[in-house]
Amino acid sequence: MNEATWIEKMRAVEGTLYHVTCAMLREEYDRRDAMQETALRAWEKQSTLRREEYFGTWAVRICINVCKIGRAHV
């Protein structure tokens, strides 16, 4: 997936990812950190995405995992 496509897909799921962070994390700064970490991991691990049409589900799963790790450090 090229960079422009990846950015487009991330923007499409940004709202959903934010809602996930709101459900899992209390502090706004933790939510912003989780969003940023999710984007970074999604970029670095895009080779693990099997089919582009599952990008949203895949990104949400990454976000959930990031939030779980964040909550464990609190």
Go through each PLM region and give its residues.
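Structural recognition of an alpha-helix C-terminal capping motif at a helix-to-coil junction
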Residues: H19, D33-L40, E44, E53-N65
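A broad detector of the eukaryotic-type serine/threonine protein kinase catalytic domain
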Residues: E44-S47, V74
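Arg/Lys-rich amphipathic alpha helix in sigma70-family domain 2
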Residues: R50, I64-H73
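A short, charge-rich alpha-helical start-of-domain segment used by transcription regulators
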Residues: M1-H19, A23, Y29-M35, W43
